Regions:
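Hydrophobic alpha-helical transmembrane bundles of multi-pass membrane proteins
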Residues: 1-227
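Single conserved hydrophobic/aromatic residue that forms the stacking wall/gate
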Residues: 225-236
Length: 236
């Protein structure tokens, strides 16, 4: 009986992982709508394509490199052992866990897009998306969720406040600092002193509001998956 209950529990947990992954993936649309709605219309195409490429490029890099760095066998508490289990051991591979971690990776990359809106070359952003999906997010997330050195010290990250939001926020801050303000944002006198700050209002407030609600809804997939997932694993 215990074996049957354990098998059912494992299947239910896998289904819940996929439901949570679908909700978190839906947040990509929310980020795109918020960023597009609260910026100028002329940049809409660039913004939509950047958010789309986050997931497209991120998926390829996460499959080839990132996932093994994140959840591979721990090497010195710093990084997961590189491997291709998704191709070589696919019969025993946990695809539901892979999909959920993939959408988390894409979310981390997307956070940066809004901070650098209207002043980022598309190709440059694609390169950034590849780097954060293949190296930055997988390695730092391994420290906590992959049994790395922070996990060994007892550090916990319930739903990505550190692995996702802190890392995405720091990356966004660095990117914004390098790029500087949008052209025309500040008017300066001959001495370089700012004499006027120009506002760049968003071109579609309802679109931005729709994005907020999409993000709100998707958040339940992120937080509730972690909470209910723990209950499922300990129920029996």
């Amino acid at each position: 009986m215990q074996e049957i209950l354990s098998a059912v529990d494992a299947e239910l947990f896998g289904v819940w992982f996929l439901i949570g992954a679908a909700l978190v993936f839906w947040m990509q649309a929310g980020f795109a709508m918020v960023e597009t709605g609260f910026t100028r219309a002329k940049n809409s195409g660039n913004i939509i394509m950047k958010n789309l490429m986050d997931f497209c490029i991120g998926t390829v890099m996460f499959v080839l490199i990132g996932f093994s760095f994140l959840l591979g066998e721990d090497l010195l508490g710093f990084i997961g052992k590189p491997g291709f289990d998704i191709f070589t051991a696919y019969k025993d591979f946990n695809f539901s866990s892979f999909v959920f971690n993939l959408v988390f990776c894409a979310t981390t990359a997307t956070i940066v897009s809004g901070a650098m809106a209207e002043r980022t070359k598309f190709l440059s952003y694609c390169v950034y998306s590849a780097v954060i999906s293949a190296l930055i997010y997988p390695i730092e997330a391994h420290w906590i969720w992959g049994g790395g050195w922070l996990a060994q010290l007892g550090f916990h990250d319930f739903a990505g406040s550190c692995c996702i939001h802190m890392v995405g926020g720091i990356s966004a801050l660095i990117g914004a600092k390098i790029l500087g303000p949008r052209i025309g944002k500040f008017e300066k006198d001959a001495n370089g002193k700012v004499i006027k700050v120009n506002a760049f209002p968003g071109h579609n407030i309802p679109l931005g509001a729709l994005g907020v609600f999409i993000l709100w809804f998707g958040w339940y997939g992120r937080s509730e998956e972690r909470r209910v997932g723990k209950e499922c694993r300990s129920r029996w």
